[in-house]
């Protein structure tokens, strides 16, 4: 995609960190953006920053837990309505949380929630927005995995199973889509991003979704949030 000008991008996890930076860079490139997050106040800050960079693009915000299919489908419907379009050009599956370190010792509900956000969030959003991507003249799906998507460890003595398993799934899904798009939707592209450890505010969203405050997280959990 040579230019983002007048395109429509969807960014999950747009309230903070890499998601916020994506929104700002897209706005700077004259791209209209719809973002979701679980914390509306963070999206308000992102919107203020984006509109100060470029007041001429359309930025919309939507509260959505990407691990819940019904919320994702409502997010899609609201995006298309507010952007007044039946298509989008870019989908950035960026949202994620940490936690659920041990398959043996971690709380089952927490383990499954982390996996759901980090994997099913990518799947549900890709599924929900696929028709809108296909309807575009040129579309691109960008999935965020992690260095832990090919190395499932933070080091000796630190279990990292739920997050790593989900990020491996994102990597495999993205690689499989390369051929699927080539055969069935050649005007679409897919990219995989595998960042290392980044100082984002993932702990805040993790706490909201898992019902924990940052100060309630143990030392290992805090280490996971720094990615």
Predicted regions and their residues:
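Substrate-binding pocket helix/loop in short-chain dehydrogenase/reductase
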Residues: 102-103, 110-112
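Residue(s) in the substrate-gating loop at a strand-loop-helix junction
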Residues: 146
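The beta1-alpha1 cofactor-binding region of Rossmann-like NAD(H)/NADP(H)-dependent oxidoreductases
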Residues: 40-41, 63-74, 108
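SDR active-site lid
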Residues: 183-227
């Amino acid at each position: 995609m040579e230019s983002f000008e007048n395109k429509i991008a969807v960014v999950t996890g747009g309230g903070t960190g890499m998601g916020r930076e994506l929104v700002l860079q897209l706005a700077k490139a004259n791209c209209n953006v719809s973002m979701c997050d679980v914390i509306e106040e963070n999206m308000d800050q992102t919107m203020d920053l984006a509109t100060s960079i470029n007041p001429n693009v359309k930025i919309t915000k939507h509260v959505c837990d990407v691990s819940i299919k019904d919320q994702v489908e409502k997010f899609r419907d609201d995006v298309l309505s507010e952007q007044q379009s039946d298509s989008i050009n870019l989908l950035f599956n960026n949202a994620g949380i940490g936690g659920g370190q041990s398959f043996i010792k971690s709380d089952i509900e927490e383990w499954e929630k982390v996996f759901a956000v980090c994997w099913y969030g990518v799947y549900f959003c890709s599924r929900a927005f696929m028709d809108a991507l296909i309807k575009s003249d040129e579309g691109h799906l960008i999935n965020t995995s992690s260095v832990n998507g090919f190395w499932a460890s933070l080091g000796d003595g630190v279990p990292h199973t739920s997050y790593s398993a989900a990020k491996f799934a994102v990597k495999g899904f993205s690689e499989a889509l390369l051929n699927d798009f080539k055969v069935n939707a050649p005007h679409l592209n897919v990219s995989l991003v595998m960042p290392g450890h980044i100082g984002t505010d993932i702990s805040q969203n993790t706490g909201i979704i898992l019902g924990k405050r940052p100060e309630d997280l143990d030392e290992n959990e805090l280490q996971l949030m720094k990615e």
